[in-house]
Structure formats: C-alpha cells, structure tokens
C-alpha cells in the first residue's frame, strides 16, 4: 500500500537541465509527469508511459513500461527513446542509472509545489519543437493560481484531516504534497508536525485532534464506513463536514491541481459560513 501511495504522491525534486534539442521519442515514468509532458507540448512525442498514466485520454492508448514496482528496463532500451522523464522518488535509482549508462537522456522531474508545477512545464517545454506551447501553459497556470489566491485569500483557518488510505490509516504531514493545496485555502493540518512525510495514524489520534473537516475516501464515508461510529466524537463528522476529493486532482501536481484548489477552498468556505 505504501509503495502505491509513494508512486501517487511526488516529493519535491526537479532537474533544471537544459535540452540539446527537440525530443522525438519520449517515455514518461510517472502519471504526473505524463500530464505535465502534455502541458509542455510534448504529447505527440510520447511513445510509452507509466501504468497509471490515464490523463489526458490519449495517454491510455500508449504502451505501459512502468508501475509502482519498477520499470521495464529492457523494453525501454528497445524503444530507443531520446528522452525519458523520470521520477527519482518513485522509479528505482539503479534502473535509472542503467538507462543513463546506455546513453539515454533523462529529465528528472517531480514537482511538489504549486510554483514548481509551472516551472516543470517550462523546463520540459525546452524539449519541444514548439516551446511556446509549454511557456503559455505555465503562464496560464500562474495567472489562474493568482486569481484563486485573490478569490480565496483568508486568515480564517480551518483544521482538517486528510486520509490517504484506510488500512492502515495514512495521512500527509509537514510540507509534503499535497499539503500546500490545503494551506493555500487556509487549512491547518492536524498532523502538520508529523515526523514522517506520510505517517500512519490511529482513529484515536484523529479524535484527540478534533478536526473541523475530514477528507476521506468514498468507501470510508459510506453508511457502514470506518468513521460512522465516531460521529459524536469528531466535529467534522458531527457537522457533516466530511468530503471526498478527486484523487487525481489533489495527489498529482499538474495543471489539474487548480481544480483541486477550487474543490478544497469551496469546502473550507462552507465550514466558515456555518460558524
């Protein structure tokens, strides 16, 4: 389970290396980097992607050469890419080193901040025959982000708990992705000071911290879900401030993160209006 979560949640890292020229045969080894490649104007040059790369729609038709367990090293070499977009937090380092030994150019890309999304798009646009496509996409992202900041700017904080999985209960701590999305909307993470990036917690710990909002999976919120019996113990449940979020929007740092921001901010606004 933790391997799958790590594959879905990029850590902060990026390689600002410059392209020697336009790439013609590109392989992406993570879902978020596939989306960013399309934003950067590289979609028509992708020849293979990671197993969970399902957006945009045309990515589903591409050959799959990696997943949370590893990458298909021999197949990638056989495809003769002139650029691999790798993710050091999710792709095995030894296998990436082997790709480098074969002379395959690698762009290491895992952006874990809102500004980093735009920067990543700009950097990858350097590998496109039309870099202006990615530059425009990055500018539009920043403009929309600024508009959302003006719309939802507030110092009225809302405490929340974000549940990533049920068995075990995993959450996010510190400034690890997607914490910045919640902070952007005025959220205060009840596990912000956790020692691990994505710690395992107990129901008792959640009860003790009394979150005003609980973001959980649809299954966890069902009538017979894991939180049902704690309605009188957790403010979020007692006030019906329990919501599910689009996991792709919130967990992948891409242009669609703007949708996640709107979703989270609107939920927090609902809480503030009821106070």
From Swiss-Prot:
Transmembrane segments: none
Segment forming the signal sequence: 1-19
InterPro entries, per the entry: ABC_Transporter_SBP (IPR050902), ABC_transptr_periplasmic_BD (IPR002491), ABC_transptr_vit_B12-bd (IPR023544), Vit_B12_bind_prot (IPR054828)
One of the Pfam families matching this protein, by short name: Peripla_BP_2
Alphabetized GO MF terms: cobalamin binding
Annotated positions for site Important for BtuC binding: 74, 204
Main function: Part of the ABC transporter complex BtuCDF involved in vitamin B12 import. Binds vitamin B12 and delivers it to the periplasmic surface of BtuC.
Name the record gives this protein: Vitamin B12-binding protein
Organism expressing this protein natively: Vibrio campbellii (strain ATCC BAA-1116)
Annotated gene: btuF
């Amino acid at each position: 389970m933790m391997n799958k979560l790590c594959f879905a949640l990029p850590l902060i890292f990026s390689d600002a290396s410059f392209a020697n020229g336009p790439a013609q045969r590109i392989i992406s080894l993570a879902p978020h980097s596939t989306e960013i490649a399309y934003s950067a104007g590289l979609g028509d040059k992708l020849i293979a992607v990671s197993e969970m790369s399902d957006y945009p729609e045309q990515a589903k038709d591409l050959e799959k050469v990696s997943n949370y367990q590893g990458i298909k090293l021999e197949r990638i070499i056989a495809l003769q890419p002139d650029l691999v977009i790798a993710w050091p937090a999710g792709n095995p380092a030894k296998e990436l080193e082997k790709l480098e030994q074969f002379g395959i150019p690698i762009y290491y890309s895992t952006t874990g901040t809102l500004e980093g999304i735009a920067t990543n798009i700009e950097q990858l646009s350097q590998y496109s025959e039309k870099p202006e496509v990615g530059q425009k996409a990055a500018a539009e992202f920043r403009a929309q982000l600024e508009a959302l900041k003006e719309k939802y700017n507030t110092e009225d904080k809302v405490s929340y708990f974000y549940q990533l999985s049920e068995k075990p209960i995993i959450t996010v701590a510190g400034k690890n992705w997607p914490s910045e999305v919640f902070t952007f909307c005025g959220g205060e993470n009840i596990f912000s000071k956790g020692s691990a990036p994505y710690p395992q917690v107990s129901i008792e710990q959640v009860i003790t911290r009394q979150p005003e909002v609980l973001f959980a999976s649809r299954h966890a919120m069902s009538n017979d879900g894991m939180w049902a019996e704690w309605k009188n113990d957790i403010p979020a449940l007692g006030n019906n401030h329990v919501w599910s979020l689009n996991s792709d929007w919130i967990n992948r740092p891409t242009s669609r993160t703007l949708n996640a921001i709107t979703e989270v901010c609107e939920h927090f606004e609902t809480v503030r209006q009821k106070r």
